[in-house]
Curated annotation (Swiss-Prot):
The lineage of its organism: Eukaryota, Metazoa, Chordata, Craniata, Vertebrata. This is Indian hedgehog protein. InterPro entries: Hedgehog (IPR001657), Hedgehog_sig/DD-Pept_Zn-bd_sf (IPR009045), Hedgehog_Signaling (IPR050387), Hedgehog_signalling_dom (IPR000320). Ca(2+) 2 binds at E14, D17, D19. It is found in: Cell membrane; Secreted, Extracellular space. SUPFAM superfamilies: Hedgehog/DD-peptidase (SSF55166). One of its GO terms (cellular component) is plasma membrane. Intercellular signal essential for a variety of patterning events during development. It comes from Trigonostigma heteromorpha.
Length: 58
């Protein structure tokens, strides 16, 4: 991520949910999902970020 988007920071906003804020089928209840934002708020990065996560084994 640092090489692809210099200066952009990622922030994890949620990784586990036990309060019922997500849909019934959400992987947050199993600790297998994460909500992330980018410091530049560019949502166009999210598809590439998802691909990078899969390539890294997430």
């Amino acid at each position: 991520v640092m090489n692809l988007w210099p200066g952009v920071r990622l922030r994890v906003t949620e990784g586990w949910d036990e309060d019922g804020h997500h849909s019934e089928e959400s992987l947050h209840y199993e600790g297998r999902a994460v909500d992330i934002t980018a410091s530049d708020r560019d949502r166009n990065k999210y598809a590439m970020l998802a691909r990078l996560a899969v390539e890294a084994g997430f």
